[in-house]
Amino acid sequence: MNNKRTFFQYVIPSVLSFALSGVYAIVDGFFVGNSIGDAGLSAINIAYPITAVLQSVGTGIGMGGSVKYSILKAAGNEKKAREFVAGATWLMLLFSAVLTVTVFFTSEKILSALGASGELLTLGNEYIKVIALGAILQVFGTGLVPFMRNYGGSLWAMIAMICGFATNVALDYTFVWVLGRGMYGAALATIIGQGVTMAVALVYCAIKKNLTLKIAPVDTPKTAFQILKIGLAPFGLTLAPNISLVIINRFSVYYGGQEAIATYACISYIICIVYLLLQGVGDGSQPLMSQFCGAGEEKSLKQTKTLAYEFSMVLAVISAILIYLLRGKIGLLFGSSAEVNAGVIKVMPIFLVAVPFDAITRVSTAAFYATEKSVLSYVLTFIEPIIMLVLMLMLPPVFGGQITIWWSAVFAKVITASVSIVLSVRYSAQRNR
């Protein structure tokens, strides 16, 4: 098998799919920002982590189930592999129901905890109520895509995402600009777009005859535990930019106010697309790494990891250069004020420093959960926000204000990447013994 050709057949569609998933948030920000202004943009920025939780739950469950599916199938245990498809489907149904009820009835309290108040709270609550009602569409829209990739359907996974994205854009234009439905319209466009992705994914899985709910009751708890054990890392990795968003927003409220929040809203919309591109490399190569792990093909596994690191670094550098050159247009894209746009021009280069380091971390994390090294993937996933929080508590009072909030986020990524290199080298040495 030509590993390089196969690698890109899996990874390119995955990268494009993740890019589109990042653009979902940008679409809402673009239409709302140009319709309502800085207040609407800030409200979307504060509320979006809740949406991200729903999507990350789907990604985590889907990735956990699909990793086990690929490893077991490669080892020749087709029957057991299908049980993990069923287990993941039941988990997505369960979590969808729980999240719908929880988010809908506690949305105002959650938004307040995220730093929203006054007009931002009102606008954010209008957005999240609708998102909560469409939780099942978000969870399944993101949760079925990893299975499509592991069934060999990376291209169809991309097509599903494109269909959802196109629907989202068309409906955002219609609901927000033409009909003037504001936050409500943006949220409705988002969940319908995810619903279209879910529909395409369901049809594909049904055609492949890999859509099943059949699992022995006695095996259900163990299967669910194994799915969640692996899925916790991709859940956290998908959510990580939004955890950072929450932390940065909370400190920015104190040090920089609404202008700083709006500035980071513009930055985060763009920078998160880059992070998702890099995650697309890791998750796109996951089916191959899981298959090679299950089949005991160590040489092919190593080659796949190397290709993933190289390709993610190339993407990181190219993306950082392009964003730096175009940074003066970013604030204007979202209809921000002149002050906010000036802030974006000044602050964006700081965040671009961290992009190559994030490339290392995301591929390392994906490699760990693809080969069932869950604990190591947890370390890389959750150490970054912890380091960031500690730095933001320590540095601003000593060195001064909002600028150290920005740099704390960068330092956290540099430290996490350093840890990922150490863990990856040690893990590779253990496998080669």
Regions found by a protein language model. Give the residues of each.
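Short alpha-helical transmembrane segments in multi-pass integral membrane proteins
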Residues: M1-S14, Y69-I136, V178-L232, M289-A354, ...
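N-terminal transmembrane alpha-helices
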Residues: N2-I36, P49-G64, K68, L93-T100, ...
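Transmembrane helical elements of multi-pass membrane transporters/channels
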Residues: Q9-D28, V130, G141, G164, ...
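Transmembrane alpha-helix boundary and packing residues in multipass membrane permease domains
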Residues: S14, F18, F30, N34, ...
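Helix-terminus/linker motif at the lipid-water interface of multi-pass membrane proteins
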Residues: V23-S42, L111-G118, T174-R181, N242-Y269, ...
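Alpha-helical transmembrane segments of multipass membrane proteins
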Residues: I26-F30, V101, G143-F147, V169-T174, ...
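Small-residue-rich hydrophobic transmembrane alpha-helices
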Residues: L41-V101, Q138-A157, T263-L325, D358-E372, ...
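Short runs within selected transmembrane alpha-helices of multi-pass transporters and secretion channels
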Residues: G62, I131-R149, A157-N168, A186-A201, ...
